[in-house]
Amino acid sequence: MDTPEKSETQIGTPVSKLKVEDSPVFSYICNLSPIKTIKPIPITCPLSSLNYASPPSVFTSPHAVSHKESRFRSQKDVSASKEVGEEEALVGSEPEQSYKNDCNTPRVTNDVKDNGCGKDLQVMMDNVKKKSDTPDWETLIAATTELIYGSPRESEAFSCLLKKTSNSEARLRGSITATSVAVTNTDVVNNESESVDALSILHRGVRRRCLDFEVKGNNQQTLGESSSSCVVPSIGLHLNTIAMSSKDKNVANEYSFSGNIKVGVQSSLTPVLHSQHDIVRENESGKDSGQIIEVVPKSLASVDLTPISPKKKRRKSEQSGEGDSSCKRCNCKKSKCLKLYCECFAAGFYCIEPCSCINCFNKPIHKDVVLATRKQIESRNPLAFAPKVIRNSDSIIEVGEDASKTPASARHKRGCNCKKSNCLKKYCECYQGGVGCSINCRCEGCKNAFGRKDGSLFEQDEENETSGTPGTKKTQQNVELFKPAAPPSTPIPFRQPLAQLPISSNNRLLPPQSHFHHGAIGSSSSGIYNIRKPDMSLLSHSRIETITEDIDDMSENLIHSPITTLSPNSKRVSLSHLDSPESTPWRRNGGGRNLIRSFPTFPSLTPHH
């Protein structure tokens, strides 16, 4: 910093300056040189023009703004002229009254341009003088208070907030669980002047904080830009300015004690729903865009508010109308809907609107034609219009039919004729009707999920019918009696082709050991066999009923009968069939004929035979 030129008064009085330098006060100040004497400088820095922005137009009129700007410039000049006046007062060139006049009037600006700042020594003298010269500083602060908005008291600035919080507590005591800081339109109309006063007081307090923390022009907002009608509680320092800048978004904070909160951006003012009370709040500024937090009750949480398209409505109506008596929606092109492959005609219904057929005659208008065609088809096939699936609960299970599958009486009576689809396509009548294939079906490689047709089993039945051998339709379930310690038998495949067994003269089977690898286990020493489970191919020749009994019950009878055990463990035995019923007194009632051939007793070894 260059040394400013001295004024004429300073040049003209060098003797008085030397007296000041030789004074004991000057020597005392020189000894205190390590002490930083720039303490009052921060007080004068906020008085610069950079720290002051033009006040908002809502608080002042244009005349007041121009007046304050002129006072602001004069105060800057007064601070500079004060230093010059103090310097001249030390040398005794000017009386002290001229300095007081400079503080009150801006007419000393011409001297400031000529003089500027004094030397460092003179600045130190000024600091000492300023500490003792309190009346002048009081006048300076009194003059600048008009530029600085008065700092509000905390109770005054937040009176609106305290009043609103007390109201919200009263509403909570009244069992309303959702409260809001925002007010309704009626509250805005009644308390309009109160909210404006609170905002103006808060604005003055923020402007004062900007002086302390050097926030330059960040809070130039008008009353229309503010989004709330109540003072937002501050967090200290100059961060209130950040809290007040809401980026032109209207935020309505909803405090709720329930967990169902739905946050979304809405384009219009929407009511806030609650389970107990319906509280409707609208934004004060009236803008269309804004963020609104609304509390959705639990009863409305699971409601699907998405609009349903016309296509979905049409599908739902069609599905609701479908049933046994509804149209099948055929797509006939050339048959005029008078053939059996027309689903509507085959089911006995007329074609209606959902059908996409062309040149249709299956309508009430052509009733005579439809009836004539039906009679003609029934004359050729009486079961043409019969139901595809007939379910009868009183039916008897047919031969070789598994009870877990679909009963044969409920299967398709006409039968399918599938060749390559394995009865897994919808054009298979059995699969389409939801039933298994039956004997009447002529399908190949059947894999119907509702019930398969076993080709090997039914082919043997057909051969038996052609050979004239009577077949049985009922079988008695075999019963095997085991010891408690006997392990379960190993399951054997049931449906496998077997060789034709030889038949004796008395229509009894003579099965060799090699032919009983399925269902029979034999002993090579005696040739007596035990059939565990008869094969279905044996049922076509004769009725077979096997009887097995516990070894403990038959221990005495087994001594006189030719019985051979089947295994070393002696767990199963087979009884031979004797020619005379008297020789088997141990046989129980209801027992069937045995398949095993009886052998004569061994000759005695006595010499007289």
Swiss-Prot record:
Assigned keywords, A-Z: Developmental protein, Metal-binding, Nucleus, Zinc
Tissue: Ubiquitous but expressed mostly in flowers and at significant levels in leaves. Detected with highest levels in developing ovules and microspores, and in petals.
Polar residues compositional bias, start-end: 466-477
Region Disordered: start-end pairs: 69-102, 307-328, 457-477, 569-609
One Gene Ontology term, aspect cellular component: nucleus
Alphabetized Pfam families for the sequence: TCR (PF03638)
Disulfide-linked positions: none
Phenotype on disruption: No visible phenotype.
Compositional bias ranges of the Basic and acidic residues kind: 69-84
A Gene Ontology molecular function term of the record: metal ion binding
Keyword Acetylation in record: no
Compartment(s) of residence: Nucleus
Domain CRC positions: 326-451
Statement: the UniProt record of this protein carries the keyword Metal-binding: yes
GO biological process, one term: stomatal complex patterning
Primary localization: nucleus
Function: Plays a role in development of both male and female reproductive tissues.
Domain comment quoted from the record: The cysteine-rich domain CRC binds zinc in vitro.
UniProt similarity note: Belongs to the lin-54 family.
Protein name from the UniProt record: Protein tesmin/TSO1-like CXC 3
Organism encoding this protein: Arabidopsis thaliana (Mouse-ear cress)
